[in-house]
């Protein structure tokens, strides 16, 4: 009986830990300002709170409706707008949607004789490069900071310290972290969006903002509504990967189609190698 009870408690602990990584808990909402909106455009009208966290389902248009909305508002008010995302691969599309100067074009524009005001007033970068001397002023002086896929952006900071991702050659991991914290603390408006905004993100913001209240905003629709998901746990990463590969092979043998999403190219290659001979497939890196 004691063993069964221990198993139940352990299961509940693991479940609670897993949920913490994918939701904003009621406890976190109670500590701050909380609003539920029916339309994303309503976020632009909210006046309470300097720092906004917007959690809305994937595909609802967070970048276009909220990011572009705050960018256009900044232009009307004569303000500077800077946007961040966690991956360099996403910056081009982000800048295209929000009408920003991409960080990779700074050097070329300076050589062409463009004025700093033209380059940096509306600016977009991946988080790893913000501390470069050519880029940092866009964030040091921005009036509105927009973070796209903010929870992933926070996790990507870890990859700098583990050297899975590099910073700009003229900056360090500590430079990046210090500037990000400084910008979030000092920008007159900070808007962080992510379908996966969670307690981890809230707690990190609390650690750098002290007693400042964050405005948490959610839409009623959640990513994955109507989809059933089974979560498996393993003590070791390789055990989890092997369990997943075994389950995938079983479904392929049954003639089913499988979509596999992974966090790193390395893991993707490893799974692709394990599935050789199991059927036809395509490896997509985006």
Label every PLM stretch briefly.
Residues 79-92, 197-201, 241-276:
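Conserved strand-helix element at the start of the C-terminal RecA-like helicase core
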Residues 138-192:
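SF2 helicase catalytic motif II
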Residues 54-60, 88, 168-205, 220, ...:
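Conserved helicase ATPase motor motifs in RecA-like P-loop NTPase domains
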Residues 1-15, 73:
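Modules that initiate DNA replication and primer synthesis
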Residues 48-69:
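Walker A/P-loop
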Residues 27-48:
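Pre-Walker A adenine-sensing motif
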Residues 199-251:
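Interdomain hinge/linker at the junction between the two RecA-like core domains of SF2 helicases
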Residues 98-139, 286:
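Inter-Walker segment of RecA-like/P-loop motor cores
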């Amino acid at each position: 009986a004691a063993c069964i009870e221990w198993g139940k408690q352990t299961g509940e602990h693991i479940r609670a830990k897993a949920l913490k990584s994918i939701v904003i808990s009621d406890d976190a909402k109670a500590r701050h300002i909380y609003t539920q909106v029916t339309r994303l455009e309503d976020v632009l009208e909210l006046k309470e709170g300097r720092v906004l966290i917007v959690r809305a389902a994937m595909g609802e248009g967070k970048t276009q409706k909220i990011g572009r909305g705050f960018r256009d508002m900044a232009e009307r008010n004569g303000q500077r707008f800077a946007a961040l995302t966690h991956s360099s691969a996403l910056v081009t599309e982000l800048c295209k949607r929000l009408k920003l100067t991409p960080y990779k074009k700074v050097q070329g524009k300076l050589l062409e004789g463009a004025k700093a005001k033209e380059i940096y007033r509306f600016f977009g970068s991946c988080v790893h490069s913000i501390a470069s001397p050519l880029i940092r002023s866009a964030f040091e002086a921005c009036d509105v900071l927009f973070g796209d896929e903010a929870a992933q952006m926070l996790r990507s900071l870890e990859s700098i310290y583990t050297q899975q991702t590099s910073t700009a050659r003229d900056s360090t991991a500590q430079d990046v972290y210090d500037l990000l914290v400084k910008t979030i603390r000092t920008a007159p408006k900070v808007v962080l969006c992510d379908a996966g905004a969670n307690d981890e993100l809230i707690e990190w913001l609390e650690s750098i903002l002290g007693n400042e209240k964050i405005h948490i905003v959610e839409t009623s629709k959640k990513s994955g509504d109507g989809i059933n998901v089974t979560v498996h746990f393993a003590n070791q990463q390789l055990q989890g990967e092997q369990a997943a590969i075994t389950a995938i092979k079983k479904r392929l043998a049954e003639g089913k189609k499988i979509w596999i999403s992974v966090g790193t190219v390395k893991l993707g290659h490893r799974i692709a190698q394990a599935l050789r001979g199991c059927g036809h497939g395509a490896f997509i890196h985006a």
